[in-house]
A protein has these predicted regions:
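Compositionally biased intrinsically disordered regions enriched in Thr/Gly
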Residues: 1-249
Length: 249
């Protein structure tokens, strides 16, 4: 789909407030409308203006955030760490095939204290009708089988340890030894597989960042619903391959 790179940044930007998006521009497409609504909801879901103008959408939330920071500083006092607060948002078109498009949302916030917080999430949108897929791309049995696959993926690809015990030592939840938790965040389709995302503090300490692992499509083939399989088959079409060649990892 056609997009336009747009940004909003407060000037002067003492608060470090910036929002950016690869904004869908085809007003006649149902998938465009669904992606725009998703962006609006990711930012708070309170903007009531037309979504045809992405710059106004970003300006609304950027201004709202900057004004809130100023009010907080005035209430708490000027000599606080909030004087160097930051808010950064970026919506990216991460992957596209002839049948679906993946968008990601990256948000970083800092309002004083030892460190800021960041989040990563996304959505997989079917082009034909705009339907957004998340965990429902997998069957119920498929999701249960994913627990062990994700655990092994995190062990070898993210934490880079050799044993389950070494992995458990890096996690916050002792129960992960018995039932490995699935991420609360919906999985997203990338050029080389499905990415599974845990947010900060969800399963590991802050120092671990955002634990993720990407499992190749062929390893998940029998776990997808029949609804999702045609979309997965499109991950090797000509449009998909313009993003990256298929990589096994």
């Amino acid at each position: 789909i056609k997009t336009e790179d747009i940004t909003w940044e407060e000037k002067p930007s003492s608060e470090g407030c910036k929002l950016a998006a690869a904004y869908p521009t085809d007003n006649s497409s149902v998938v465009t409308q669904n992606i725009r609504e998703w962006m609006n909801e990711q930012l708070g879901g309170t903007y009531t203006g037309s979504l045809d103008d992405g710059k106004k959408l970003l300006e609304y939330y950027g201004t709202e955030r900057a004004e809130q920071v100023k009010r907080d500083i005035a209430e708490i006092g000027e000599n606080t760490a909030m004087d160097v607060s930051a808010y950064y948002v970026q919506f990216k078109k991460a992957f596209e095939t002839e049948k679906f498009i993946t968008y990601t949302s990256e948000i970083y916030e800092y309002s004083g204290g030892a460190h800021g917080g960041e989040s990563l999430s996304g959505g997989v949108f079917r082009k034909s009708d705009g339907r957004k897929f998340g965990w429902d791309m997998f069957t119920a049995n498929g999701k249960e089988k994913l627990r062990g696959m994700i655990k092994n993926g995190l062990k070898s690809k993210f934490f880079k340890v050799n044993s389950d015990e070494e992995l458990y030592e890096r996690l916050l939840d002792e129960n992960a030894r018995y039932t490995f938790p699935l991420p609360e965040t919906a999985p997203v389709c990338r050029p080389n597989g499905v990415e599974f995302i845990y947010q900060q503090y969800e399963i590991a300490p802050y120092a671990a960042g955002i634990p993720t692992c990407t499992l190749p499509y062929d390893s998940l083939e029998n776990l997808f619903t029949v609804t999702m399989k045609p979309l997965i088959e499109s991950t090797t079409d000509s449009l998909a391959l313009t993003y990256n060649p298929i990589v096994k990892r």
